[in-house]
Amino acid sequence: MVHRKALAALGPGFAARGFARRPAPAAAVWHRPAAAEFVVAWVQLTRSPDAFGWYGSRFIIEFRRGAEPRAGVLGPGFRFCQLLDDGGRERVRAVQNALIRRLPPPPARVLRMLDDHARECYLAQGRQVTAAYGPDDDIWFRHRDERDLDAWFRLLPVLLPGVLDAVRRRLG
């Protein structure tokens, strides 16, 4: 569902900046030539979602320059939020916190089976992001359901033009 929504919401913005969609079934991957290489953008889902279903999952958007027009290409790169200004990162934090506020209480059965350290780490997923994100923070877009994804895919297309300007400056 993440890739489908990403393709619909972000595809027009990428196309307007000269990116073509990579013909990968059900994957949100775009590329454009950059001299003898390619700039590639893709949506990457976490490999470690919440196994207990409380706080959900997350995704990022990666940008890299490399020899091949495919997701995971080796080369210099950045993640979406590294390319935002302070205002853009604040908008991301606002959505992140809105999603966190909507979380239900953590499941008691899960809390009972975790040791103190694991419980603290688990509960941290339900705490608001109180400090402003910095340009070097590794920010993942959290989601539990379609409503959360809709919130992200309302915001991300608004931020995409500025991000793609930064991609052109930094990666070509």
What are these regions (language model features)?
Residues 14:
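Acidic, metal-coordinating catalytic segment for phosphate/diphosphate chemistry
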